[in-house]
């Protein structure tokens, strides 16, 4: 998976079996002081190559090649 935006260590990481969004955020070092877990987005490619945007819960499991975007908090 790949994680970018307001995280301490953006980049590509190995997806562990049954990894949740919360565990992925921890792998990326957590959010920055400006980041928020509200409004997270996962960009996910389907079998025919279309990309959909999913707003996950922290307990949702990742899929191979998911891209997580962490937004900046407005407050």
Where are these regions (language model features)?
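Ser/Thr/Pro/Gly-biased, low-complexity, turn-/loop-rich segments
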Residues: 1-75
């Amino acid at each position: 998976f790949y994680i970018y935006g307001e995280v301490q260590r953006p980049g590509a990481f190995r997806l562990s079996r049954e990894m949740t969004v919360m565990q992925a955020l921890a792998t990326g070092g957590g959010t920055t002081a400006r980041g928020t877990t509200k409004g997270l987005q996962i960009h996910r490619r389907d079998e025919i190559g279309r990309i959909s945007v999913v707003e996950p819960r922290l307990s949702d499991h990742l899929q191979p090649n998911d891209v997580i975007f962490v937004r900046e908090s407005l407050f």
